[in-house]
Amino acid sequence: MLDAGADARAGDPDADADAAVARFVVITGGPGSGKSTLIDALEARGYARSHEAGRGVIQDQMAIGGHALPWCDRAAFAELMLGWEMRSHHLARRAHGPVFFDRGVPDVIGYLKLSALPVPAHLVAAAERFRYRRDVFIAPPWPEIYAQDTERKQDYAEAVRTWDAMVDTYAACGYRLIELPRASVDERCRFVLDAVTAEA
């Protein structure tokens, strides 16, 4: 969830939508592409951020012996990710300045499409209602840094397919994609901040 130091605000998520959306910066991409490492670095520079829904849900489900996991029940896993993303969106309204999202609602659509599962109407509605800054940063597949772990079980080929799915999904949702350079974390931070502050 979001580390903004505030509880969610009750009310209509459309309130102050234009001002909020301009601050909500999504960084997406395939697994193992350095996306979360970049967001960690932005957080260290004082920016608000959200945590990746997929990892959070997996950690919670494994802790309680749940089955809403990508290797058990992908549809249930997607529903929990959607709830996480919507909650993060609400929480972000209390932050000041840019908020960096480790994925967004469209990622859940991309995940279901990648899994050859139907995309329910309520998920499409969520993608229309919970919007982000139009320019979305996407981390390209990067084989030299890709690594699996206990929560990331995908192989590199699936990481590439995930990238493709996110490119298609974000474009279909009306976003403009900006590819991150395969560069150091500091260089990526400068790239993102230069782009975001240039439009501020």
Regions found by a protein language model. Give the residues of each.
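Hydrophobic anchor at the beta1->P-loop junction of P-loop NTPases
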Residues: 27
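P-loop (Walker A) phosphate-binding loop of NTP-binding proteins
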Residues: 30, 42
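A glycine- and Lys/Arg-enriched "phosphate-lid" helix/loop adjacent to the NTP-binding pocket
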Residues: 116-183
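Conserved glycine(s) of the Walker
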Residues: 34
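Glycine-rich phosphate-binding loop used to anchor ATP phosphates in small-molecule kinases
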Residues: 78-131, 146
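Conserved substrate/cofactor phosphate-moiety recognition/catalytic segment
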Residues: 43-84
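Extreme N-terminal, non-catalytic leader segments
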Residues: 1-23
